[in-house]
Amino acid sequence: MGGGDLNLKKSFHPALRRNQQAVWDEEQKALAERKRTQQRLDEIKEERAKEEVQRQLEAAGGKKKVDRVEWMYQGPNDGQTGTTEETEAYLLGKRRIDNLIKGTEHKKLEKDAGTESFMALQNANTARDTAAKIREDPLLAIKRQEQAAYEAMMNDPARRRQLLASRGIDEDKKDKSRRKEDRHRRRHRHRSADGEDRHHRRRRSYSRSQSPRRRDGSREDRHRRRRDDSRDRHSRRRRDGSDEEGRRDRDNRSGGDRHRHDGDRRHSDEPRDERRDNRRDERPRDNNRQYSRRSYPSDRRPRHNEEDDKAKEEERQRKLAAMQSAATELDVDRQERLADLEKREQAAREADNKARERGGDRGFVNKLHQQAEHKGLAERMGGARRGYQKDDD
């Protein structure tokens, strides 16, 4: 049994061929590197010798040489005429640089890349194209579908109530706060209207008291006063919105008109001194009338309570109607689901009956096969033995 030298089986043994090949390759690389280094040293020596000769010539009175990096301006990348791709193509030997040096290809590129082509591309984005792009935008279509679904859900009172409940918002409290704000706004509006009307009446009474007292019994003054009283009565009746208050106001106004007409007649018949006395007697009556007018808006407060009760009742009726509609919708959905389930069960029963009718002819044979599959070995041997006995008989 000769196994040879066991050292040759080691991977690091120097007698192996692959190890010798690796050593030889490394030696060749070192020699090539030494040759390149020596060549570069020789080139440096030659350049130094040339520089020394040039320096000696310049010192002897020769022409001076200007040191410039001309190698940066040489090659295919001549200013704006070249690109990185062209430089790589030139280095790989796939492209000639004659045309780049001459400049003909650069001019051709300038013609092709003019402003006309750029503007032609810009003209494609017209208003119609932009509208079509916006209309066919899938994200915009998705947003529209989401908005439509949200609006449908908010229009449904039951689902809207569920959504608000999930967010922790009480719709009843929200409605109460809204009604309170509306009530406060109405009260503020009525108070401002009453203040303006009171100020207007005060200014009119003051202007009447400051005006001269001549021609009180004339027909034009009576007509003017009657027209002013009717305008005030109409505005107050429209603001109050009550037939009872309007009727009371008309009675008061008619009584005042009768007193005024009687006083006018008395003024026209009586002497001037008696007329002055009657005017003094009538002043407290006018003051009482103005006081009654000022105290009139205080009777309107119960009417606001009635309006609030009416608004609450309407809101309650609206909520009740919404609850009833939601319950009706739930009942309709439940009935539809039950009807659909019943239809499915009926279709399944019909399919089962058809399958039974189709397999009724082969039912007996299938039953025999099933019985044969479930028989044991003893039963089969016993049946075969009985068959043999019958044959012997």
Swiss-Prot record:
Residues 25-65, 310-358 form a coiled coil. One of its GO terms (biological process) is mRNA splicing, via spliceosome. Signal peptide: none annotated. SMART domains: Cir_N. InterPro entries: CIR_N_dom, CWC25, CWC25_splicing_factor. It is found in: Nucleus. Residues 38-55, 168-180, 213-232, 240-288, 296-318, 331-361 have a biased composition (Basic and acidic residues). Residues 38-61, 151-393 are annotated as: Disordered. GO terms for cellular component: U2-type spliceosomal complex. Associated with the spliceosome. Belongs to the CWC25 family. PANTHER family: CELL CYCLE CONTROL PROTEIN CWF25, PRE-MRNA-SPLICING FACTOR CWC25 HOMOLOG. This is Pre-mRNA-splicing factor CWC25.
